[in-house]
């Protein structure tokens, strides 16, 4: 079997200058083969920039577009192709958008292999360790703060027992942050599990320290990305605060960045995104690294049902895969792109036993939002 094409699909719902905080854009790849098997992958990244990286012409031996690197290759040789893409694009890649694009292709290759062998991806990764995975919901809060009551009330009614919020109006105004936190905690009650995603908005160690102490009475399960992940010393000091769990890692790529982050940040929880960190292949490496270093791994996931399906397959096989993020985005790219999206049911998502990612894309929706 040989790869005949790498098709890049860029989707965007709003106007080109609009924000996509709710997941209103997407980068999808379809890897085509001469045997008719098509693999699907995605990256939660800038779609048009990722497409440019995949389709780039060759400048020299280590400055090559990913499509050129893998055309004509055997898609079942997944690790070989990961290494080949990494090496032959390292002059322009190695981190960031280059690995984001590689992640999408890697997921598509696992989809192909799983379909070819007629077995679920988790079986190719070593076997299924769990039939279902605990899920927490993630939403973007609103302001005025009272508007969050109905949001979280509806999520509790759906069966969520753990929620995370961040983005939107949260992070840039301390008084507003505390007001939003107060309303949400009051609505869910003291025994309900809450996480907060700051997305680096507290900027400095001193400001983050001040805010962490202010939100301590709200009993947060973890504080995610309080500062930029470049500030490893600041992370380490925040992680040393008693009774507070610090998490991060969604913007990091490859085992190399995660090794440094785990070793120097002292973060309690690491959060690689399977569509950014290097795909399923690299996620398995990072997972083993986290286990060796005594870190809890909770994957980041706030994009389409493609990301969700890939993350479920990984967590089904991972030793420590006991928690998954479930987006509450209202974007049609989250709700409708995958026709048979894995559902949330009473606190869990169940692991499908179908070969491949087991998903069906809405091709009419793709054509509607393709750019």
State what each model feature region is.
Residues 1-40, 44-51, 330-335:
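Structured beta-strand/loop patches that form or line metal/cofactor-binding pockets in enzymes
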Residues 213, 219, 230-348:
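Shared catalytic-loop signature of beta/alpha-barrel
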